Amino acid sequence: MGRDQVSHKRSQNSNVSEIPDLDSSLHRSEDTLVAEIIEAMTLAGVCVVRNLFTKSLVDQVLKDFEPHVSSTKLFDGYPGNGCHLTGLLSKSEIYAHMVVGNSVFEKVRNHFLSTTFRSWIGGKMMTFTSPPQLDSTICSYINPQSPGEHLHRDDAIHYGWNEAASEYTVGRDISMSMFLALTESTRENGTTRFFPGSHLWDYSQDFPSADDTRIRYAELHPGDCYFMLSSVTHSSTDNRSTNRPRVLAATIVTRSHLRQEENQYLTYDPITVGRFPTWLQRLVGYAPSAPFLGWVDKRDPRCVIDPKAADDHCGGEYYETNEETLN
């Protein structure tokens, strides 16, 4: 084995091989549950939390989403069939208030993604803390016989880049997700696969093969959740079932200082922006950042202010035309 191969292997070593799995119904206090989730994610980058939401909540969220499913499609470049439903806050009040607003999720995301900064102002050292912001909401309906995704990290859209680390420190991650199972989510019908401990890996190294023995699967019942840091190597898997769609609602949050100083989207109304030349619309923020950051309903935001505008970009086209081999 050559030196580069040895280095690669070491940079993808992990001290954890199993899935941290907690049952929220067995914890006597919320703070104890939160502490154990944080401990698990610090070690493995992920944590499965059972029974975080009730069956009645899951049923209501599914009912709220259902009228929107037939008119929705998948992200461009995404394999298989089904749909990605976005903008979930306006589609389900119970999702907005009870899922996004869940206090366990709030405490976990605040731990990993709150940013504290100190600066001299007027002769005084001031301290500022910025809690995370909502990044996106996506409910994935993946139908039977749909292929899975390629392995990836979710922080690629924010250009996350880390070296290998022997232990986790807060500040390493840009974002995190909570996936709520709205149906059974299993290896057979396309649940998420991931590498425990991959949040500590070297980003300059390619991903292992999809049949690597270290891969684990987040198998969930309705109401269970899968928490994941954006530095974790993961993907959806093939839905090999014949009659079992897999439905997961993802709530993604990111560090809130990753935004413009002046809120361009409320400062100028869409009609005014529609009169701007294309270059100015893009400068204001009405354009996606590659690979695909800043979309509206899975499309270039210029389509909102000008329905005749062609999409400038989709994720699949970007990956096909900008391939690079890292040495």
From Swiss-Prot:
Binding site for Fe cation: 152, 154, 234
Catalytic activity: fumigatonoid B = fumigatonoid C
Pathway, per record: Secondary metabolite biosynthesis; terpenoid biosynthesis
Gene3D superfamilies: q2cbj1_9rhob like domain
Cofactor: Fe cation
EC number: 5.4.99.-
Molecular function via GO: isomerase activity; metal ion binding; oxidoreductase activity
Family matches, as SUPFAM superfamilies: Clavaminate synthase-like (SSF51197)
Region (Disordered): 1-22
Record flagged with keyword Phosphoprotein: no
Protein's UniProt keywords contain Disulfide bond: no
Phenotype caused by lack of the gene: Completely abolishes the production of novofumigatonin, but accumulates fumigatonoid B and asnovolin A.
Example GO BP: novofumigatonin biosynthetic process
Keywords: Iron, Isomerase, Metal-binding
Complex and partners: Homodimer.
Function description: Fumigatonoid B endoperoxide isomerase; part of the gene cluster that mediates the biosynthesis of novofumigatonin, a heavily oxygenated meroterpenoid containing a unique orthoester moiety. The first step of the pathway is the synthesis of 3,5-dimethylorsellinic acid (DMOA) by the polyketide synthase nvfA via condensation of one acetyl-CoA starter unit with 3 malonyl-CoA units and 2 methylations. DMOA is then converted to farnesyl-DMOA by the farnesyltransferase nvfB.
Family under the similarity heading: Belongs to the PhyH family.
Protein name: Fumigatonoid B endoperoxide isomerase nvfE
Organism name: Aspergillus novofumigatus (strain IBT 16806)
